[in-house]
Each structure stands twice: as C-alpha cells, then as structure tokens.
Amino acid sequence: LWMVSEGGTDIIDLTTLKPTVPRDAKGVLKNILNQPAVHVMKDSKGCIWLHCANKLNRIVFNEKGDVETVSTLDLVVLNGPNIALQDIDEDGKIWAGINGEILKVDWDSQGKLTTTPIAECLKFEPGTYISDFLMKENEVWISTDRGLFRYNKSGNIVKRYEHDPNNPRSLSQNYLTDLSITNDKQLIIATLRGVNIYNPMTDDFECIASGDFQNGSSNLLNSNFINCILTEEDHICLGT
C-alpha cells in the first residue's frame, strides 16, 4: 500500500501491516520516498508512477518485487492541488495533465521519460488545472477548473460543458475535482458545489447538493465541497 503526503511516501506491507521499502540496488528510491508527494498510481504493467517535488517518477520492478529502474521527468509543476495521471490506453504509457495540456508519457531506449501531446485540441487555456480524466466507451472525459471536456478519440474532437446560471441542467459549477463511473456506466462528476450525474439521453446533468442554491436540491450531503468520489457496486462514496 503506497500512501503519499507532504511528509513523503510511505509503503505498507499488507501481510504484516508494517512499513517496508522495496530492495533497490542503486539506492535511488529512498531519496524519492523522502520528498513531499501528491499522487501515486499503478499502471497496467505493474509500474508505479509517483509525483513528488515537481517531478514525475516511473518505478519499474522485477519479478521478485525489487526495484529494477527509476526514470524521472523533471519540471512537472502543478497548476492545482493534484495531478491527473491515468493509463488510458492500458499500455503502461500514461496520460498526464501537465501545464494545461494532456500528454502521453513514454520512454526512450535509454529509459528516459519523454512526453508527446495527445492532440492539439487537448491544449487548454494557460493555468488550467486538470484534476482527472477517465475512459468511458470510446471517449475520454476530462475534469478541470474550467468545466468538463469530452474527447472523442476516433474523431479527435472535443466538446466542452460549462455552468450556465440560466440552465438548471448544466454543471452546478465549473471547478471540477474528480470523476468516477458507476456499475451501470453512469458518469459522476465531483465539484465544489455538489455532485453532478451525466444523462447521456439528454446530454446534460442532474445535481445532488445540500442547501437551496438550486431547485430540487436536498440535504443528502454534509458539504457541497466534494474533494473526491469512489463508486463501489450500488454505492457512491463522497469525500468532503
């Protein structure tokens, strides 16, 4: 279990529930783990991607679980509290939201990390914070602090969704913090003004929120400031 915080990265052995550090013959990992970190993920190939100290690290393990190589991409500066990382293509080459743009992170023959823009249409306004993206059918949904974007990979086109004060079926706010998909393929969008559920039949949203800022709102939430969401079977867990 890998956990990141301002104090660094902690690794817990779930069989003993004690701290552990994978064997690393080159001794590179220890220094990385001591740096303040904001995001960690595992890709489809079993590699760990760790963002810390404005750097993105790819940690590769051998069959014994020992560290084989550590590759680093420098100057990965955040535009917000976190960084969006996802193995969208399930090839181990992750998509990353960096400096208002979505890039694919690859590596060369020497193991050095390189980046390539996914598409020209996925370059956003300067300073845009990309909080998350996920794959749903053949489209990638992208949450930002400036609305929701729907990218069709086949057609290489983007559609943007924004809050409209005159439309109660629009997004409840443009600052989006997280995305998730339920078992029945519903897209859930977390914002700092409640939760939005996308309706593909009408191409709009239903809002769940506390208070009376929108007609039909309820007191289902203890706060409208949603930081993260997790869907599990028929349940939606909200962190506020």
Over which residues does each language-model region extend?
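Carboxylate-rich, polar loop motifs that coordinate divalent cations or form catalytic acidic clusters
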Residues: 1-240
